[in-house]
Amino acid sequence: MSRRNDSSENLTCSFCGKSQDEVKKLIAGPTVYICDECIELCNDIIAEESKLEEAMGPDVKKLPKPREIKDVLDEYVIGQDRAKKILAVAVYNHYKRIESMGKPSDVEMQKSNILLLGPTGSGKTLLAQTLARILRVPFAMADATNLTEAGYVGEDVENIILNLLQAADYDVERAQKGIIYIDEIDKIARKSDSPSITRDVSGEGVQQALLKIIEGTVASVPPKGGRKHPQQEFLKVDTSNILFICGGAFAGLDNIIQQRIGVKTLGFGADVKSKVEKKAGELLTDVTPEDLLKFGFIPEFIGRLPVLATLHELDEAAMVQILKEPKSALVKQYQKLFEMEHVKLKFTDGSLVAIAREALKRKTGARGLRSILENAMLDIMYEIPSQTMVKEVVISEDVIYNREKPIIVYESVAESA
């Protein structure tokens, strides 16, 4: 409602008492009025309370149950049901453990850090990001291949904590209840089974450096990033309650498991009678700490990641589902973009299968879907904003396979009239 009223009555805000002449806007309810200044004040109070709730971290009473966590994960990640159940239970127990720490107990609960094993593009990073979003906690990512021991050229492991602190807007309390995802963790495996005489600054040395922050230590972090120097004051961050999720493809681990359990993979010369045939991805579900030890991880590092979750390689059907079903599905995103131009975008079933098959050829998992779509959609997305009378665009499999132009349906003269 406008702040002015044609009647001679001078209206006032029911909350602060200011008249309509003293404020910019006066909004009417059934029997009350509220001014723009009071609305702004209410918004500030609500925002402040939200910040306070976030600073306290997830409340166990409000913490989603494992089933509820998995239900939300299902909206964003297709398949991988067992991995999602493992993650949901581990995360729920982690934050219950934090809540119980202030209470007297004769049982000491250890932190349940997680190791995710699965091929590239199977959803490891997306699972970790979605978990942080569900729980409303700060989230940071790091690439293990960039990490080196302190004193060597490369990224110091304590920079991971700095990234989390930045995600929490330098709120130490919030950061201490956050989630850190370390990708490509398999790349810091020791290069051989025997301890190296020479310094392995990007392998075993990094494992040793990560041990401290993963198990729980008080890390000294520069307040605004940058290099450490003696005169600098540091922020102290306790990592005891930070949940660490480490992920990797672990190429070659299936061979180690195969040797241990005596299973032959599919191929010429496989003994069908005495051996059970399994694909590489299926073998990873049988992984044990001993297999990871042989792969090149030190026993202490394996011990700090007690929860193991395996993700399977995505097949064609899963790829098609990923394209159209999740909340952030690429098909839905492109349809929304076209909708903004008042154009309907349709993908034929054949086109979705074609995109999935092309992605499988690239062996990059779901990660390859976007680049295939971007390439196929470039020309039509360039043209559509400049065209009028376009009603519908249809993407067929020929657009994907043969780079043909999409089918464009125009409005009839009668419709436009």
Curated annotation (Swiss-Prot):
CDD domains linked to this entry: RecA-like_ClpX
InterPro entries (UniProt xref): AAA+_ATPase, ATP-dep_Clp_protease_ClpX, ATPase_AAA_core, Clp_ATPase_C, Clp_protease_ATP-bd_su_ClpX, ClpX_bact, P-loop_NTPase, Znf_CppX_C4
Annotated ranges, domain ClpX-type ZB: 1-54
Record keyword Endoplasmic reticulum present: no
One Pfam family of this chain: AAA_2
GO molecular function: ATP binding; ATP hydrolysis activity; ATP-dependent protein folding chaperone; protein dimerization activity; unfolded protein binding; zinc ion binding
Gene3D superfamilies attached to this UniProt entry: 1.10.8.60, ClpX chaperone, C4-type zinc finger domain, P-loop containing nucleotide triphosphate hydrolases
UniProt GO BP: cell division; proteolysis involved in protein catabolic process
PROSITE patterns for the chain: CLPX_ZB
Swiss-Prot/TrEMBL keywords: ATP-binding, Chaperone, Metal-binding, Nucleotide-binding, Zinc
GO cellular component: HslUV protease complex
Binding positions for Zn(2+) per the UniProt entry: 13, 16, 35, 38
UniProt-listed SMART domains: AAA (SM00382), ClpB_D2-small (SM01086), zf-C4_ClpX (SM00994)
Annotated positions binding ATP: 119-126
Oligomer status and interactors: Component of the ClpX-ClpP complex. Forms a hexameric ring that, in the presence of ATP, binds to fourteen ClpP subunits assembled into a disk-like structure with a central cavity, resembling the structure of eukaryotic proteasomes.
NCBIfam families: clpX, PRK05342.1
Chain's role: ATP-dependent specificity component of the Clp protease. It directs the protease to specific substrates. Can perform chaperone functions in the absence of ClpP.
HAMAP family on file: ClpX
Family according to the record: Belongs to the ClpX chaperone family.
UniProt protein name: ATP-dependent Clp protease ATP-binding subunit ClpX
Classification of source organism: Bacteria, Pseudomonadati, Thermodesulfobacteriota, Desulfuromonadia, Geobacterales
